[in-house]
């Protein structure tokens, strides 16, 4: 499997985001489940696509929040590739891209109708935090954060909830 940097408007990436939207609309029973403006080419700093056997099977993006942090957006893996390590590989690549840009904290929002995502982020070392930004007041949102600052052993530290 390869993780490739792509443009936001890449056709395969756009198709993955479309598939994610269809799945989320079905899970939430509505297309109105994302607080705030959706990510766009103008505000997405990194967009990665996972490719397996020549086929795009997952994606994820980073949007800078401030000088030291970014938000993970549009993390998605096609259903038939879930449980194969694609999501973990994408997440680690996004974290590495964040560190390369000097962002040592990554945050994300997922939702109450996504128990698989909640389990995944907890397993990957993310800690639940209070809702932030456009998610404040949302009854469908659950937010997470991970501190990417290496400790003295070189492993990533985890920040406790604020």
Per-segment meaning from a language model:
Residues 1-73, 78-80, 91-93, 97, ...:
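Acetyl-CoA-dependent GNAT
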Residues 8, 107-110, 118, 122-123, ...:
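Conserved catalytic-core motifs of GNAT/GCN5-like acyltransferases
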Residues 68, 84, 100-104:
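Short coil/turn segments at alpha/beta junctions that flank glycine-rich nucleotide-binding fingerprints
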Residues 78-80, 84, 112:
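Active-site acidic-Proline motif in GNAT/NAT acetyltransferases
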Residues 91, 98-110:
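Conserved GNAT acetyl-CoA-binding A-motif
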Residues 115:
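Conserved catalytic core of two-component sensor histidine kinases
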């Amino acid at each position: 499997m390869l993780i490739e940097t792509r443009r936001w408007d890449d056709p395969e990436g756009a198709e993955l985001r479309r598939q994610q939207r269809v799945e989320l609309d079905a899970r939430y029973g509505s297309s109105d489940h994302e607080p705030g403006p959706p990510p766009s080419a103008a505000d997405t700093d990194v967009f990665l696509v996972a490719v397996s056997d020549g086929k795009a099977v997952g994606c994820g993006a980073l949007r800078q929040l401030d000088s030291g942090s970014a938000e993970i957006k549009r993390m998605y893996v096609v259903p038939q590739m879930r449980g194969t390590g694609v999501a973990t590989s994408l997440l680690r690549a996004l974290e590495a891209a964040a560190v390369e840009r000097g962002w040592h904290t990554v945050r994300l929002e997922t939702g109450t109708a996504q128990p698989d995502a909640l389990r995944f982020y907890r397993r990957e070392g993310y800690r639940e935090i209070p809702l932030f930004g456009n998610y404040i007041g949302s009854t469908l949102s659950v937010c997470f954060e991970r501190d990417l600052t290496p400790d003295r052993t070189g492993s990533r530290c985890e920040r406790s909830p604020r």
